Curated annotation (Swiss-Prot):
UniProt cross-references to Pfam families, sorted A to Z: 7tm_3, ANF_receptor, NCD3G
Example of a GO cellular component annotation carried by this entry: sweet taste receptor complex
Source organism, top-level taxon: Eukaryota
Membrane spanning stretches: 567-587, 603-623, 636-656, 682-702, 728-748, 761-781, 785-805
Organism: Pongo pygmaeus (Bornean orangutan)
Extracellular side: 20-566, 624-635, 703-727, 782-784
Family: Belongs to the G-protein coupled receptor 3 family. TAS1R subfamily.
Protein localization: Cell membrane
Side of membrane Cytoplasmic, spans: 588-602, 657-681, 749-760, 806-839
SUPFAM superfamilies assigned: Periplasmic binding protein-like I
UniProt protein name: Taste receptor type 1 member 2
Function: Putative taste receptor. TAS1R2/TAS1R3 recognizes diverse natural and synthetic sweeteners.
Swiss-Prot/TrEMBL keywords: Cell membrane, G-protein coupled receptor, Glycoprotein, Membrane, Receptor, Sensory transduction, Signal, Taste, Transducer, Transmembrane, Transmembrane helix
Amino acid sequence: MGPRATTICSLFFLLWVLAEPAENSDFYLPGDYLLGGLFSLHANMKGIVHLNFLQVPMCKEYEVKVIGYNLMQDMRFSVEEINNDSSLLPGVLLGYEMVDVCYVSNNVQPVLYFLAHEDNLLPIQEDYSDYVSRVVAVIGPDNSESVMTVANFLSLFLLPQITYSAISDELRDKVRFPALLRTTPSADHHIEAMVQLMLHFRWNWIIVLVSSDTYGRDNGQLLGERLARRDICIAFQETLPTLQPNQNMTSEERQRLVTIVDKLQQSTARVVVVFSPDLTLYDFFNEVLRQNFTGAVWIASESWAIDPVLHNLTELRHTGTFLGITIQSVPIPGFSEFRERDSQAGPPPLGKTSQRSTCNQECDNCLNATLSFNTILRLSGERVVYSVYSAVYAVAHALHSLLGCDHSTCTKRVVYPWQLLEEIWKVNFTLLDHQIFFDPQGDMALHLEIVQWQWDRSQNPFQSVASYHPLQRQLKNIQDISWHTINNTIPVSMCSKRCQSGQKKKPVGIHVCCFECIDCLPGTFLNHTEDEYECQACPSNEWSYQSETSCFKRQLAFLEWHEAPTIAVALLAALGFLSTLAILVIFWRHFQTPMVRSAGGPMCFLMLTLLLVAYMVVPVYVGPPKVSTCLCRQALFPLCFTICISCIAVRSFQIICAFKMASRFPRAYSYWVRYQGPYVSMAFITVLKMVIVVIGMLATGLNPTTRTDPDDPKIMIVSCNPNYRNSLLFNTSLDLLLSVVGFSFANMGKELPTNYNEAKFITLSMTFYFTSSISLCTFMSAYSGVLVTIVDLLVTVLNLLAISLGYFGPKCYMILFYPERNTPAYFNSVIQGYTMTRD
């Protein structure tokens, strides 16, 4: 025996204990093809009491559920409208048989009844492909747990089942439920609409209340997972106590409600999401009213979002703003009149029996209860009824296709459940300006709406304030909401206020929504899209002020021609160049005179030429550094300057040799003269300087670099050498040594003849260079700002002037103004006088 047969046998006994109470015309209408309807006409909570007894609960023992009865009336209206339509199913009469499923175990008996034959027998067969059940399709039930129970039976027969309000995502599994479809969006869309509502109003600190049944647990878990991905935190989540059937609330359950409302009072969260059947909420909201809890935003799940009985607790208006997620409102022409006409007709007569009846087809108080809520049902826009309406029409259109109907006739024949199911999957038609079709998961893409509860009798009690489109997964058409706050301000529900621009979050506690706001320091910025908890450092060429979300390009600082210090130094350099050029011309014209020859002769022209080149290198200090300008700064100028100083040092040594060492060390002096000692020395010094320059360039490179101005971080100083201070000491070490040597030899020759006594001029030049270089290094060790470049250039020009004017200036002065002292006779007399004095 297969698993299907085993399942059927285990429940076969129930088919023989079916009661036959009085028939009510609301529940049964004969026809060529019957639709089964499962509606909750009485309110009862899931419990365990009736599961201990082998009997079906009697729904009439519980309170009437107005919405359920209203939905049942809509199915009656839909079938009647289809039967009156001469084009949809011409010549075919559609009937129905509906059952009240107020309790979880009530679903088993009706589904077996729907599957059985007219004689209440359900045969055990190996193949049900050609089996014809009592009904061709089932509409309902309303909640996910009951739908799964029914679907597990109907799926064995592939009997079409269309639910109108069950939203569980489990129902999308077509492997488990191949015959199940629904005319309402899934829980995924309901939760997404809630989350987008919270995001729109920037609520990130909420409270979640759930019922203890599967509906509450599953939706609470789904909401928690969705909120975690959107950085919305749950302050706390509580489970509402669930009453057992026909039982009063116990003291423990009462205390539980008191504790929950106390936590609501103490919490800083002001948005409360409630997933629960409506009956559980009556005692809860009464406790809320008793403790005078106000100022909340209540977000209702679809199970109670448009419940007229809860809305009838008018004092709830003082507890805050009520928003609910529900199906879109689609007015059905004529339905309100149909319901009111049916209510005015009064209850059906009792005592009428029928062998077709099953149990729980009674609702003596439904008409009176519906009549008392008729106004609110009419004003609310008949929301969920369209889901039932479209479900019935989907079956009718499938029958239209299956029976080969045209505008006048249909071919009546046996309809097998699996055939009708295939046609239902294919339906695609327009109903009241809405396209009706099922996606691959069996869902219908109807819009959801956010409704606000209103208690003004002249207004819709469930006023639409926004709409959610499942296909776009987007909240649209958000309208103004009447907030129950001072000055109608939007309620704030945040653990921590939103940080201002440029502030990072410092977590406080375990919730990501609770944090402190700390300003980002200068030089850092906050990238909200990457990390809200750490400020990122700006790139090296950018900067930011405090509390910034982006960095800006640092201003590049270098010497520019329009700046006053640059102009002043350029004028000094021009003066030095012109004066050096003039000295060169004077020396050229008086090349054969003793004054020029005593100053060094050809060596003077080498020095003057190098000085002119050094002056011409000065402009490379101005403007943005480049590889070529850096090469001139680090190689050409130091080399020129070193050769000049080496010439002075060698010239001083040569004079000392001529007057003091020639007589003492004649052999050494002869070698010095024979092998061109001055030029060999200068060549050696030049090569040594070139080695120093090459080593410096290899160590630091020629590419321009930038460094931050210590006085103003938004400025980047562009320079040729990142370690200019260290490289300056390295490059000038030889020059400083030569200046000391030149100074020493000049000091040794202070007793020489006047025309050869250059001690005071060399001392002036070398002392100035030595002092300025040491001062520059000292200045750079204490300061590294933008003034370094201009001070370096100024010292460079002054050192050049010290040689040009300090060393060559006095000689030009003697040549021009004392020509009588620039004769061989005068020089010889001076030398003879020096010799006689030494003797």
